[in-house]
Amino acid sequence: MARVRHKRKPVAEMNVVPYIDVMLVLLVIFMVTAPMLNQGVKVDLPKVSSEALPQDNNKQVLTLSVKADGSYYWNVGSEVDTEKQTDSAVSLEQMTDAVTKIMSARPDTQVFIRGDKAVNYGAVVGAMGALQQAGVPNVGLITEAP
């Protein structure tokens, strides 16, 4: 007797394994390149610690304050004065010129920024950018203790 052979129907199923491989390769590429993206102002900030930073009394200290309305004030002294601010408001350009002169005269000057908690984030970033243009290598941020 002769056997009757039935034709098999073609399988219409899509193989998704190559797509998963491509997706994983792209994921690895994005994970490697994401930390290399450069965002924001290049300023070398000190690491945050729970203790106050030690003060070097031999170094001059420049304090830049940014009030809630976005106005800039600066004060030069032997220590950071967080209680009183008697200087008059200056523009960002005036502050940059003054800081450039101070840094050229005394390059070891410590620079700190006091930003009001209600101030626009862009005002503090603008101040940090201006300090970078003035040649300040390190900027400290002053906060209140909890």
Swiss-Prot record:
Keyword annotations: Cell cycle, Cell division, Cell inner membrane, Cell membrane, Membrane, Transmembrane, Transmembrane helix
InterPro entries membership: ExbD, Tol-Pal_TolR
Gene Ontology terms describing biological process: cell division; protein transport
Pfam families xref list: ExbD
An example Gene Ontology CC term for this record: plasma membrane
Disulfide bonding pattern of the chain: none
Bilayer-crossing regions: 16-36
Record's bilayer topology term: Single-pass membrane protein
Principal location: membrane
A single GO molecular function term of this UniProt record: transmembrane transporter activity
Subcellular location: Cell inner membrane
Superkingdom of origin: Bacteria
Alphabetized PANTHER family for the sequence: EXBD MEMBRANE COMPONENT OF PMF-DRIVEN MACROMOLECULE IMPORT SYSTEM, TOL-PAL SYSTEM PROTEIN TOLR
Known role: Part of the Tol-Pal system, which plays a role in outer membrane invagination during cell division and is important for maintaining outer membrane integrity.
Family: Belongs to the ExbD/TolR family.
Complex and partners: The Tol-Pal system is composed of five core proteins: the inner membrane proteins TolA, TolQ and TolR, the periplasmic protein TolB and the outer membrane protein Pal. They form a network linking the inner and outer membranes and the peptidoglycan layer.
Protein name per its UniProtKB record: Tol-Pal system protein TolR
Species in which this protein is naturally found: Pseudomonas aeruginosa (strain ATCC 15692 / DSM 22644 / CIP 104116 / JCM 14847 / LMG 12228 / 1C / PRS 101 / PAO1)
Source taxonomy: Bacteria, Pseudomonadati, Pseudomonadota, Gammaproteobacteria, Pseudomonadales
